[in-house]
Design a protein with these regions (language model features):
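Conserved hydrophobic/aromatic beta-strand scaffold that supports enzyme active sites
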Residues: 5, 62-64, 146
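Hydrophobic/aromatic beta-strand patches that form the interior of the parallel beta-sheet core
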Residues: 18-20, 46, 63, 117
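Conserved nucleotide-sugar donor-binding
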Residues: 14, 58-74
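The conserved acidic donor/metal-binding loop of glycosyltransferases
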Residues: 21-25
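A conserved donor-nucleotide-binding helix/loop in the catalytic core
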Residues: 1-18, 44-49, 58, 95
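Catalytic core and acceptor-binding pocket of nucleotide-sugar-dependent glycosyltransferases
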Residues: 67-173
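Conserved donor-nucleotide/metal-binding helix-loop-beta segment in metal-dependent transferases, i.e.
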Residues: 26-58
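A recurrent flexible, glycine/aromatic-enriched loop bordering the glycosyltransferase active site
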Residues: 51-64, 90-94
């Protein structure tokens, strides 16, 4: 499970730890400054949700954890606990995949600590699992630089045209 790689990386990092799935392709130049702007010090975590009002789990192909923030440390402790104490954690949840677990914990913590950055918070998305609603990452500002080739997109070598819900200007999306 990738969550253990996340825990390990966080113990070896300082300031921010960013997770990016291995099936993510950086298609355009991305400067350090542009990358750093995606990680505001005022947020304890950044991630890609599925749009306003969505009841589904986040897209966990890219997220950043502000390791200097105590709330983030609490999140990481709970994220690990849910797996380590499975009988009192993950096995009590409706679904067991990392994105569902991640979303469950974030949603609980946002009640008292709402200072998160959801890259898709203001985005309109179709119903989840259809069209771009099931593939929000490329429809956020992250799509300017990266493509997440999840699922059968790996075989195609690129996300589907039907996944794109916003006007993309980058050359990568024109071909």
């Amino acid at each position: 499970n990738k969550t253990y790689a996340v825990y390990d990386a966080c113990t070896r990092s300082k300031d921010w730890c960013v997770w990016m799935d291995a099936d993510t392709f950086v298609h355009s130049d991305w400067s350090y400054e542009q990358f750093a702007e995606l990680l505001p010090k005022t947020s304890w975590i950044t991630y890609v949700g599925r749009g306003k009002g969505s009841q589904t789990w986040p897209e966990c192909g890219f997220y950043g954890m502000n390791l200097n923030d105590g709330v983030c440390q609490d999140f990481l402790a709970e994220f690990e606990r849910v797996y380590e104490d499975a009988d009192n954690g993950i096995f009590l949840l409706e679904e067991w995949h990392d994105s569902f677990v991640f979303g469950n914990i974030i949603n609980r913590m946002k009640i008292t600590s709402p200072n998160v950055l959801d890259y898709s918070a203001e985005m309109y998305l179709r119903e989840a699992k259809t069209g771009g609603g099931g593939h929000p990452l490329i429809n956020t500002k992250l799509g300017k630089w990266i493509d997440h080739m999840k699922g059968d997109r790996k075989n195609q070598g690129k996300s589907k045209t039907s996944d794109i819900m916003v006007k993309r200007k980058e050359d990568y999306w024109r071909t």
